[in-house]
Each structure stands twice: as C-alpha cells, then as structure tokens.
Amino acid sequence: MATAPSVSYSMTVRLEVPAGGTAVSQLTTAVESSGGSVTGLDVTASGHEKLRIDVTMATTSTEHADEIVEKLRGIEGVVLGKVSDRTFLMHLGGKIEMASKHPIRNRDDLSMVYTPGVARVCMAIAENPEDARRLTIKRNSVAVVTDGSAVLGLGNIGPKAALPVMEGKAALFKRFAGIDAWPICLDTQDSDAIVEIVKAIAPGFAGINLEDISAPRCFEIEARLREALDIPVFHDDQHGTAIVVLAALTNALRVVGKGIGDVRVVMSGAGAAGTAILKLLTAAGVKHAVVADIHGVVHAGRKDLVSADPESALRWIADNTNPEGMTGTLKEAVRGADVFIGVSAPNVLGGEDVAAMADDAIVFALANPDPEVDPAIARQTAAVVATGRSDFPNQINNVLVFPGVFRGLLDAQSRTVNTDMMLAAARALADVVAGDELNANYIIPSVFNDKVAGAVAGAVREAAKAAGAAVTAATTA
C-alpha cells in the first residue's frame, strides 16, 4: 500500500529566493515532483531583489523530507535557511501544563489558597474523606498510567519515550471532555510494583486509565486494581477499542441488513484489544466467532492450549468461541464469513480472501499504519470497510470513546466500570449517526463531532446509576 504524504511528517523550510522570475513556482514543482505536498507558502519578508518564503509541506518520512530539502537547496538562486519539523515544534517543552483556577493577587488570596486558610479545608476532608471529591481536583482527575511496554506500534520503548503519548492522551481528555488527566510513566515493568504504585497514588484521582501495558500482564494488572480500588480502572487499549468496534459494527450491520446474532465473525489477533473486542461482542449478542493468531485458528484442542493457564485470555477464547471446532489458518477461516475484524499485523489477507467472504461482507482492518488488507482492494468486494487510519472513511479511533466514558464515570462518581456501561457507551456512539446519515462510508462519527462525548458520557452515567456503582449525581467540574 503506497504511503501518502502526512501532516505527521510536516516540515517548514525557510528559503530566500530571487524576487522575479519563476523561483517561487520552482519551489512548488520541486516539492510536488518529489512526492511531497505543499500545504503552505508564506512570504515572511519582501524586497526589490529577494523574497523570504516559508514553504510548509507534508512528506512521507524524515528521509523523504531530507530528500526534498536537498532538492530545494539545489535550485539556482535559492538560499536555504532554517528547516523545522512541525511535529517536534509542537512537543517542545511538552504539550500540557497545570494552570490555577484562581488568581493569586494579594495576601487575602494567598491565605485562602494556601496557608493558613487551607488547613481548614484539610481538616474538613480528614473528618469526612468523601469531601475530597468536592473540595479538590480529585473529582475531575484521571491518572493515565503506563510502563512503556507496548506503546502504539513502537513496542517496549520505556517510560520516558512513552511520555509524549501520555501527554497527548491527557490533552485529548481535556479537549473532548474537560477532564484533567495526568501522565504517570512508571519506571518498572513488574506487575506487583505497578499495582502497588497505582494503589498508593489512587487517593488523588477519580479514575485510572491504563495505557500501553503489554499483554498478558495488562489483564492481571487491570483485574487486581479493579478489585483493590473504589474508583474505575479502564485499560483503554482493550475496552476503548472494543467499544468503538462494537459501535461501528452495529451500524455496519444496519447498512447490510444483518443481525448481530446471525453473523459469523472472524478475528485476527488474540492480544489485549482482540480479547476485549471478542468479550464485548459476545456480550452484545455475537454467537458465531472464530479467532486466529500467529499459530492459526484458536480451538480447544490446539496443542499449545491443552495445558494453558485456565485463567489466561487465550484459554477463555478457546472455551468461548469457535462452536463448530474449526481448525486451520486465518485465510481458511475467513471464507464465507460475514465479518472480519483485524487487530494484528499488516497484509495478512489479500483481495481474494475478502472476495471469498459472504455477500455484503464487513471488513474492519485496524492494524496501523498498514492494515491487515489494503482497504482500497477490500472495497472492491466488501460492502463496508473500516480502518484505524484517518485517510480512509470509517476510522476506528479510541478518541471517540475514552473522554466520554470517563466523563460519565466521573459525573456519576462511579466506583467501577463494567460491561453494561461499555455496552451503553457503544450504543450511544452508534446512535450519534442518525438514520438519514448512515451509509457504507459513514458508520462511525468523526472524533470532532460535538455530540459524541456528551452522548457517551450520558449513557455511561445512567448505566453506572442503574448498576448501583454511582455514589451521587455529581456536579461536573
């Protein structure tokens, strides 16, 4: 699949060029003929003989950007100035900050914000610990916790290298749900240590978002923290993905006119996301599911599963899917299937595999940046196609879920998060797409749809109340 220029590799190059002639058009031609895309051309200084121009361009990689810069340098009469990577510029000094809600202008302000007045508030909380939600930032705070062991598609890069992702997550919490999220990058990958650290910092937060922790450790860590804490613990890589997939599948099935209990679903990938998707789809009514991993189709009799830990995710998959006892490869399993969901690796299927699926097939190829099957090829025979990419229709993106889910949990002062709340979130997200809007290229709303976070939050809040997990109907921050 050809890589298109992306704003992720956006560069601004400052150049001095002759004022007359064709120098400016030569700049544009040099970028476009090299496979880049000019997104901005700004004159920052002008004289009778010279122009200073900032050329902003999207490229496909840092190497591609370097090639284009060298081509610009070679144009006669052009003097190359500063070259800026716009993504790195956005990260200089970090992307988030702490800000005070009240100005501190004089002694009166100081004595109320800090000592001695703050002591009265401390004692009020000491007498009634529940007042911490009312009188501190706790009620609107979420810890975004990682050990850096499974960051995006980058792998085990450690806590410092994971920090830019956690900052970005915190920024999205604020942008879409008004939540104060705090990046917590732990310099340990010991499960016991992670559990103890999160338990120790939990008093300052109303929720815990686990992020980019490798499987199978993530399952144990989440389960232990849910058992130990009286605030919701949500591993977004699992459940955020699962909720968006269920919402998108709900609408895709509406497009093709099939029922969730009637379709055969084949999934590629049995890791954290795949397991969570499978469990939520099962709770939503999927009865015929088959999962394949690197060893082929998962079934109860597979040699590597006979002695597997009965509590393991893979054992759960073997015991709760594949009722027909299918064996073999992913390609064999997908023949005649109604739905394919990929959360695994690029290019595991070809166009011929999609063509061998049932009529009006649904394909969710979610591996990033390269999907399990080229979406352009899949569209030739599948009725509905979704990916994890922003440059194709129907992007499956967790940003559609985690802000609204936590907004609802925090507003309800929920002590936990459960399957019913996640099902409610998926239904609410699916319903944001109105009946007269629904079509094969629009089964899931944009992350910038203003209705999304509020709809998801409202559904989760009501589900928390119905489950008896809500303390009160809290006032939002």
What are these regions (language model features)?
Residues 80-83, 183, 209-212, 233-236, ...:
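General beta-strand structural signal in soluble alpha/beta enzymes
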Residues 39-44, 81-83, 184, 211, ...:
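Flexible, glycine/charged-enriched surface loops at secondary-structure junctions
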Residues 232, 236-237, 256, 365-475:
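Adenosine-phosphate binding glycine-rich loop
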Residues 1-92:
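A conserved regulatory-domain signal marking ACT and ACT-like small-molecule sensing domains
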Residues 314-384, 389-391:
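Rossmann-like adenosine-cofactor binding region
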Residues 80-263:
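Glycine/serine-rich phosphate-binding loop and adjoining beta1-alpha1 elements at the start
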Residues 152, 159-177, 229, 235, ...:
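Glycine-rich phosphate/diphosphate-binding loop of Rossmann-like nucleotide-binding domains
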